[in-house]
Amino acid sequence: MDEEMQQTFMISAESAIDTVLEMEPKMSEGSSDELTLEFQKDGAGVKGDVRDIVIRREDIEWEIGLSIKHNHDAVKHSRLSHKLDFGKEWFDMPCSDAYWDAVQPIFDMLKNEKDNGSRWSEINDKDEVVYVPLLHAFMDEVNRAYKEDKNMPRKMIEYLIGIEDYYKVVSRDSKRLTMIHTFNMHDTLNKPSENKVSAITVPVVELPTRLVALEFKPGSDNTVEMYLDNGWQLSFRIHNASTKVEPSLKFDVQFVSMPMEVLNIECRWN
């Protein structure tokens, strides 16, 4: 990393420190124990913990986490393919035989095209023969899973945003701005210290309990939108990530809206 980038990171981090300290009085509470900052191992994200840094004090059994992003606010990048089981990965319910029966002919066709060295630009009507039927199979499977397990909406959001509470800190270099987003689903953030209550209240975020609607985005053949209760809305856009055909497609998952309780705090750079 060059010196200029290091300097940018320092300015970005410094702009957010005072706000994090204000929201977390226990970080600066007078105590004889050590305040420990620990970098998470890469494998933690696979297990549902998206925090990059964990800050803790052992003697009071307290910890908070930070997720650090640079110039992007991406949700998990997923795929649909002939072997990836999104149901098992997202909400711990393996995809049904009906799903695999629906998608197998599409992926078999794509595998043949790959073996022939075809390019995506050479696939006629790829929206109608690939994107639309795959998304229909995806929606049918999500609806099927929801009928079987009413906790599916909560499990899916936890897969996307993580199972632990944390602050997401996003550096926006071009805007000279650092954003802090609060994810306080389990009411572990923003606790008072022995002698201070934060001037900033970090609300508890309610996870979804109901799948309200799942349908194609109006005017689109490659994007579906999911509406959940408690203020959660997502979009799922399917697209090919390479020039040549593969039996695998990228699934771009984005939040269209989040609950009001997720605070979005702007920290301007000096």
Feature locations, PLM:
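Short, positively charged
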Residues: 1-51, 56-270
